[in-house]
């Protein structure tokens, strides 16, 4: 059990890094997503006692359609993660690519559903910020220390490695660096592995995201990949989304792969994955348990259902599998 003494035994060595200025807009999406999740949690969309330790509650109220969209996203990704954990009986590892301020590790621990090891990867600048929060806030550090076999836990500005949890600062476009750092933190390529990318691939060029998907498929014999991002971006609504992001210096470099659900599945299948499925978020929303829908729709009034539908039709949840027939990975669905 973690104690105050053990909490204080997390030590850090500060270091600096130079980040490409062109990535500033992409890094800014981490803050946007964290603020949106924090607000949705604050009004009761889902339970997450950890997000408050990474981001302050914004004074700006988020629109109801945004809150419902984030609820569907969190619910959908969570259901697929738990399905993978059940199939593997938690004898597996999870690699969250572009994790930002994600709190899945802590929430899975609370549900006694932790994999053998949970890895997070993001830009070094984002990782530095996350590690600072972990170091300074016992509700975040204590669960890590409880699972760690040693009395002290070393971390520097860009990496934390413990028995069950690791955070790595790396550029997903540099696969040799990514693999080297993951292996340094004891990533086991023989274990069934779930990789997660939420609004990550779309900020990479099609070639870069294809290389990442191929690397993932080639690195693990039994694996699953979850991808959440834009879809149906060729219509007028999609073009407006692209223009709005460009005005914020955030270019969707990989938007051409987001034409349709079919193009999303084809990308996965053409880069080493054996099965691929995809649903847009409106379809996913319509599949939610009716009791949950009634609960969240009672939280706040939504003027225009059409706006929610437009938004949800332009995001999708995709998942792909490779190997793992004996585990039933191909049977995983939403």
Swiss-Prot record:
Gene Ontology MF, one: protein C-terminal carboxyl O-methyltransferase activity
EC number per UniProt: 2.1.1.233
Keyword hit for Endoplasmic reticulum: no
Pfam families, sorted: LCM
InterPro entries: LCMT1 (IPR016651), Ppm1/Ppm2/Tcmp (IPR007213), SAM-dependent_MTases_sf (IPR029063)
Biological function: Methylates the carboxyl group of the C-terminal leucine residue of protein phosphatase 2A catalytic subunits to form alpha-leucine ester residues.
Protein name: Leucine carboxyl methyltransferase 1
